[in-house]
């Protein structure tokens, strides 16, 4: 794997500093270009896919984080606006938030950046299990129903949950390939988390997925 020591140091300096900064001072994080030429063979990855609820507090290196987010919800055909996962009528209604110690970010796949949302560590709100508040990354999948105008409320709910499931499986497969631990969860205090995230009424939290290294 190509190493980028300068970026690595800069990334974690940013993560360490933003805890003392105001929300307006929180800066976007430009992710490294995803590496799409590595990984284990598919059949081996399927054999290794598993759920884990034991995580170390070790941070994910910048390249691994970038690769993870691209695998989860990046554009694999950017010229036609298509992603690594399908969505109902290509609504692309899911927003993927990234909760880390330094704050809450929104993954912008088009610019390959993390856009700052909250200068707070809200990892503890991303689930009800103890490991959630100390694991390095919690992905939060939020449906934006304003992008699904033609569907009924019931259809929006069904399709968005299905689309989030595709993202979750991509994360599972990536983690199996990279030797990471992960668990896909619906056990969330959704009203409390939605309030902290300042979501609109037509946005709905669906699932959260914890990612990190297994506990040593």
Language model feature labels by segment:
Residues 133-136, 202-204:
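Short coil/turn connectors at secondary-structure junctions
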Residues 35, 141-145, 213:
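Short, small-residue-rich loop/turn micro-motifs
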Residues 21-135:
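N-terminal amphipathic, basic helical "cap/leader" segment at the start of enzyme domains
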Residues 9-17:
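Bacterial N-terminal signal peptides
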Residues 1-9:
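Bacterial N-terminal signal peptides that target proteins for export
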Residues 49, 68, 96, 137-148, ...:
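Small-aliphatic-rich amphipathic alpha-helix that forms the alpha element of a beta-alpha
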């Amino acid at each position: 794997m190509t190493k980028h020591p300068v970026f690595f140091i800069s990334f974690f300096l940013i993560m360490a500093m933003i805890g003392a900064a105001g929300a307006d001072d929180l800066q976007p994080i430009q992710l490294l270009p995803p590496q799409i030429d590595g990984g284990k063979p598919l059949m081996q990855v399927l054999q290794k896919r598993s759920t884990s609820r034991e995580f170390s507090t070790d941070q994910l290196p910048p390249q691994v984080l970038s690769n993870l987010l691209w695998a989860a919800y990046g554009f694999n055909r950017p010229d036609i606006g298509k992603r690594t996962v399908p969505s109902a009528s290509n609504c692309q209604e899911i927003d993927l938030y990234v909760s880390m110690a330094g704050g809450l970010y929104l993954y912008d796949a088009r610019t390959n950046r993390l856009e700052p949302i909250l200068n707070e560590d809200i990892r503890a709100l991303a689930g009800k299990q103890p490991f959630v508040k100390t694991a390095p990354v919690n992905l939060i999948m939020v449906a934006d129903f304003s992008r699904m105008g033609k569907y009924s409320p019931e259809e929006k709910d069904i399709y968005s949950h299905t689309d989030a499931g595709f993202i979750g499986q991509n994360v599972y497969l990536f983690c199996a390939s990279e030797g990471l631990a992960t668990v896909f969860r619906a056990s969330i205090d959704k009203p409390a988390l939605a309030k902290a995230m300042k979501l609109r009424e037509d946005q709905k939290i669906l699932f959260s997925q914890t990612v990190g290294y297994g506990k040593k």
